[in-house]
């Protein structure tokens, strides 16, 4: 499957696969192989697993406006195969459901992707001994959790972009009127009404994608009312406690942590507090922190020409 010439993914060939199924709803992963691989002899390519952002509520695996230019550029420079899964979203799902999907994806990746590459005669074969796990916003939590839940898969490095890695942060959990990405959400009473109405109407359904433009008001309401974390924890599950998981595993692959200091969606404090825990629990972890002036998703239009991004990519290349 080809992308339009003006797409950020125009240098890749796309193939979609069902990695799991929930109540007759397919969970899809897109595999993007470098187009130039078709012009060369068969070879092994490193794998970049990408978990999309959207506050666990909106977005989708190939929602282009939220894909960082530099990340696509870096993947191409490494001749990498990108694998981007969808997953169930809040509030129809819970955090436990989402991490069930994470588990199902990793099992599928290791059991099925090599044989799919073989049967489809891909010129680029996935090298599952070289995995880079990347996630934006909510997806950044899933990238870190992937390494903690599956240390046996030997993820070589992680990139966490403005992720809610630590939940006990007032700006994330305490309801209060506030401007988010330059916009004031509806007043608290109206916001609560919108949330309740949506949850009532969507009860029992499964959703794995949501246009941010169509669902933006709902997301703003959930953020303002501090509901994201409570919805994630609606079904108790030990996998949702990142610091506790980190204490159990005791280690983490090399981590490049990127976060805007002016983030009004996921407070920078979420990354700061996680780093404090990491330095106590696993002080030998190789970490690069890029705390930059900027809002949520501040890096999407940036390229590898930026010194700090080039330095971060060099950091990844030493481990991946």
From Swiss-Prot:
Enzyme class: hydrolase
Domain of life: Eukaryota
Family according to the record: Belongs to the 'GDXG' lipolytic enzyme family.
Its job: Probable carboxylesterase; part of the gene cluster that mediates the biosynthesis of squalestatin S1 (SQS1, also known as zaragozic acid A), a heavily oxidized fungal polyketide that offers potent cholesterol lowering activity by targeting squalene synthase (SS). SQS1 is composed of a 2,8-dioxobicyclic[3.2.1]octane-3,4,5-tricarboxyclic acid core that is connected to two lipophilic polyketide arms.
InterPro entries: AB_hydrolase_3, AB_hydrolase_fold, Carboxylest/Gibb_receptor
SUPFAM superfamilies named among the record's database cross-references: alpha/beta-Hydrolases
Pathway: Secondary metabolite biosynthesis
Protein name per Swiss-Prot or TrEMBL: Probable carboxylesterase M8
